[in-house]
Every structure is written in structure tokens, then in C-alpha cells.
């Protein structure tokens, strides 16, 4: 696949979840409203001429890390799902850090005035608050900050969706008995895998906590996400859709020959800094 395919109180959600004090620095991106102007069901305006740009950075091969077989299936499934939702998809495979930074810069400098929002996908290895390009690691901050309101004016007040599938070398979580008495064990999220989320208002960060077993059709997380986007992407509020994805993945046990993965559980996470409800309704 070729590269480049195609006034009153400040809402608390406008402050990043990881550091609310630091979040005040992003005041230009916060949504200021009076209590009477924003109802509990206010939605993002999604009737612009374009849905928006979606970048997919797909890292299968690395200079000094093991490869990620199966990521091509994730890439292709996401491409189809996002195109079906009317996003303009551009795919970049096995890019070096300098190339990723260049593509990020180009997208941040583009005019998004007639777009509903923006999507960025990164499929790679990851650790803490970094992701790996072909040759070096890049911080999550470096791929989010260029799209904040102080730098990308045409995306102010618009949803910015980040999907991060970052494998951690096969680490999985032991299931524990559900305190609710259900048959299915709950999943314990490995705290070491929680990424720093240096985003701001109108961002939503969607990411896998740990590595799901890779099959020919890709990772558990991306499989489930694409399935839910295909079934409910145009009808279900986006955070509700992500909750369904969490449930799907958490109920799936690794079924492979690796005895260390038998009965293991995985669960993705999302952190929403959205200030309104998000529906990706069909374009007219």
C-alpha cells in the first residue's frame, strides 16, 4: 500500500485529565459557556462540508525492535471503517521519526475550516508516554500538541480522535473473579501500561492497555473497534461505542499455543476530554 492514501464558567472537561493545573495553559482551546447555553445533550456540529482528515501511521518494521506481524490487517480494517464514515484517510507505513513529524506538521498546518474533526491513528510498539517510529521513539505530546487550539486554529472546538494501538511485548493481565458474581472474570488493567495523556479540550484518546494476541485479522482491540464502527459508527454516541469495544475485548481470552497467555485478559481504555456528545452521523 502506497503512502499518502487517500463567557461564563469553563467546562471542566476542557482541562486535561492528567494535570488540570497545567491544562489552564491551554485556555485558548477551552469552551467557555454560560450555564444556560449548554444542555446535557449538546452535540458537536458535524454538518461541515467534509468529515475530516484521518492519518494512519502503521509501524510494522523497526530498525532495532521486533516486527509487528498482523498490523497490516489492523491498518486495512481501520482504513475501510474510517472511509465508510467519510473520513479522508492517509496511510503512512514504517516511517522514521523525522517523516512522522513532517506529516504531523503538514496536517496541523492544513485548513480544517470545512471539516467536522480530525483523526490520528498510531499502530506501533509503545512505552509509557512514547510510541516508536521506525528508528526512534516519539512522545504522545508531540503528536497531540500541534493540533491544540493555540497551534491549529481551524480545529478549535472540533473533536480530535486519537487511536493508539501500542504493543508492549505480549504482556497480559491475569483475570480475577468478578465481585458482581458473574461468570466472566474482570480484567485488571496493568498500571504500568497507562499512557500519559498530554491532550486538551475536545480530544479523546483511545488506546490499548496491553498487547492482545495477534491473529491473521489483527489485534483484538482494532478488530473490536472496527466491528463497532461498522455496526454503530453512524448511530451511537462515540464514547458509548468505545464502552462496547472495551466490553468486547475484556471478554475475549487468548486462545493460542503460548501457555503464558492462556486465560489472559486484555482491555483497552479511553480518556475523553470531549466537551459535547459526538455522533458521526451520515453525511448528507
Locate the predicted segments by residue:
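Cysteine endopeptidase catalytic domains of the caspase/legumain-like
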Residues: 1-284
